[in-house]
Amino acid sequence: MTHFSPREIVSELDRFIVGQTDAKRAVSIALRNRWRRQQLTGSMREEVLPKNILMIGPTGVGKTEIARRLAKLANAPFIKVEATKFTEVGYVGRDVEQIVRDLVEVAIGQTRERKRKDVQARAQLAAEERVLDALVGANASAATRDSFRRKLRAGDLNDKEIEIETQSSGGAPMFEIPGMPGAQVGAISIGDIFGKMGGRTKTRRLTVVDSYEILVNEESDKLLDSDQLTQEAIAAVENNGIVFLDEIDKICVRDGRSGGDVSREGVQRDLLPLIEGTTVSTKHGAVKTDHILFIASGAFHIAKPSDLLPELQGRLPIRVELDALTRNDMRRILTEPEASLIKQYVALMQTEGVTLDITDDAIDALADIAVAVNSTVENIGARRLQTVMERVLDDISFSAPDRNGETVRIDAGYVQKHIGDLAKNADLSRFIL
């Protein structure tokens, strides 16, 4: 779990996302409150519940990007799901409890990776012995093994091919149980029923260097206590889990519609107990959702937040409105983030030996065109910049392999020549930009 202060979290998000200070502050405070709760003891820790967040803002302004970056920062079980993928319990499709089951799987993966590092030294020695067995046989003399061990550690045998027995990574066969709700629940793995009897192995032919990582992971897993690992993962989900629920506006029931809808209002009703706090059964054990943080987001360009069920609105007490992007924001998005679009295209063309020299007035022109098209056609926010950049650099991208060693200067005139007329023609830009 992260120990960053809210200020540090915001500055980390600033490296990748332009503007949206209110949203960054809200998620940074929520993340820090997870740490604060862990410092409490006794009954007070149980009483402190997370304050769930609803992010409202037009498409393409950074809602999903905040979630992506937060996942890397959080150092806690984190899952991003789209609300539109779920249906009401009892109907064909995924029910919302699958969110928690997926979150547990994420936590188990994270916990396993962390614990593997603790036993890595012992696992590497065991993996080395298995490689030596494959090279010289299990019955070779100690002198022969030592000789090959020295060569192995020096890297002299890295390209040599060996045959090793590895655990089969292919999942056990699945079969459907008719009548069980939800495709994910109805599909039962034979491996889950019969346990890990004997475990399936297969022989693979690999180079020494490629086999090493596989063997180290296998030996690490043998040294880990799977029951303890699962318990730690479930505890991490219950105390530090974060669920980012995207596209929540798409499950609103708008005015004028009557009757429930299994993929709209029904999903909202199913979300109520999950967000409020319930116990979800998973194949690893029961998981309580009382302290899982839910961050919901939606564009709400057709529906309104008030179209959500009142009970669901009450369970998302912190509202954050993200601002539409201005021309200056567009300009900053092109240049400021660590992996900005300009830097990406320059790096891509560099692989072909072509150097792009993009001037400041070209960046101004790109931002102006993106804003103009957004205002006349459909406002899709920063995503419009990708469309505009692709059109401007289309010729260069196509001919780059034949222009090795060239430097191409892109200024405002170049931008206008390649896209200016298209942007002015509203009918054409509606279909092309």
UniProtKB/Swiss-Prot annotation:
Family from the record: Belongs to the ClpX chaperone family. HslU subfamily.
CDD domains to which the protein is assigned, alphabetical: RecA-like_HslU
Gene3D superfamilies: 1.10.8.60, DNA helicase RuvA subunit, C-terminal domain, P-loop containing nucleotide triphosphate hydrolases
Cellular compartments annotated: Cytoplasm
Origin: domain of life: Bacteria
Assembly: A double ring-shaped homohexamer of HslV is capped on each side by a ring-shaped HslU homohexamer. The assembly of the HslU/HslV complex is dependent on binding of ATP.
UniProt KW Chaperone keyword: yes
Any one annotated GO CC term: HslUV protease complex
Name of the protein described by the UniProt record: ATP-dependent protease ATPase subunit HslU
Species the sequence originates in: Nitrobacter hamburgensis (strain DSM 10229 / NCIMB 13809 / X14)
Residues binding ATP: V18, G60, V61, G62, K63, T64, E65, D246, E311, R383
GO molecular function, one term: proteasome-activating activity
Cited InterPro entries: AAA+_ATPase (IPR003593), ATP-dep_Clp_protease_ClpX (IPR050052), ATPase_AAA_core (IPR003959), Clp_ATPase_C (IPR019489), HslU (IPR004491), P-loop_NTPase (IPR027417)
Swiss-Prot/TrEMBL keywords: ATP-binding, Chaperone, Cytoplasm, Nucleotide-binding, Stress response
Function description: ATPase subunit of a proteasome-like degradation complex; this subunit has chaperone activity. The binding of ATP and its subsequent hydrolysis by HslU are essential for unfolding of protein substrates subsequently hydrolyzed by HslV. HslU recognizes the N-terminal part of its protein substrates and unfolds these before they are guided to HslV for hydrolysis.
GO BP: protein unfolding; proteolysis involved in protein catabolic process
Record has Nucleotide-binding as a keyword: yes
